[in-house]
Amino acid sequence: MRKSKRERQRLLQETIRENPFITDEELAEKFSVSVQTIRLDRLELSIPELRERIKNVARQSFADKVRALPLEEVIGDIIDIEPDASAISIFDVKEEHVFRRTRIARGHHLFAQANSLAVAVIHDELALTAKATIRFVRQVKEGERVVAKAKVTGKTAHGRTIVEVNSYVGQELVFSGTFEMYRSNIEKKDGDSNEYRG
């Protein structure tokens, strides 16, 4: 039986409160209505679109965890982070991110997402990329969502933090990178200073 508009909107608010990452398409399927109906309901209820909801959750949840750069400077939207351990961000490839003729994402956007996530996962006031080894596995097209997963895997002999980042579209690996990160609070050894030596 089809729900009344009032009941649907009440359930819509409840569903989004429980899962702010749910898409309009998933909501439309759940409530057996069109995507346009969901968008109208959201507008009437002053519920922001998915992208804004993700940013709001990130601001509330991760503002105190990301120290090396402001959240608005991260390329993509952080959806999970454990400082000095792991982080996840999503990046929706739009028209402005692709080559006009081929509709393929420009590589620097995929690199920027991975690099900024590698910086964000470092729990320090200053984190810089000292070295990056990257590999573009397959082309990413307009309309695809890239999920980047960063994991702190260790340290180099010089005390740089190693961060592995793998980016996926669905379950398919599209980009991988190993980033050596300089950080300002490197633990001092026998009177060594923590200044950067390149």
From Swiss-Prot:
* Domain called MaoC-like: residue spans: 102-167
Q: Does the keyword Transcription regulation apply?
A: yes
Q: Which UniProt keywords apply?
A: DNA-binding, Fatty acid biosynthesis, Fatty acid metabolism, Lipid biosynthesis, Lipid metabolism, Repressor, Transcription, Transcription regulation
Output the CDD domains linked to this UniProt entry.
Answer: hot_dog (cd03440)
Which domain of life does this protein belong to?
A: Bacteria
Q: Which GO terms describe its molecular function?
A: DNA binding; DNA-binding transcription factor activity
Any one GO biological process: fatty acid biosynthetic process
Q: Transmembrane stretches, by residue range?
A: none
Q: Which InterPro entries match?
A: DeoR_HTH (IPR001034), HotDog_dom_sf (IPR029069), Transcription_factor_FapR (IPR017275), WH-like_DNA-bd_sf (IPR036388), WH_DNA-bd_sf (IPR036390)
Establish whether keyword Protease is in the entry: no
**What's this chain's function?**
Transcriptional factor involved in regulation of membrane lipid biosynthesis by repressing genes involved in fatty acid and phospholipid metabolism.
Task: Output the NCBIfam families linked to this UniProt entry.
Answer: PRK04424.1
Protein family membership? Belongs to the FapR family.
From the Swiss-Prot or TrEMBL record, give the protein name: Transcription factor FapR
The gene name reads fapR
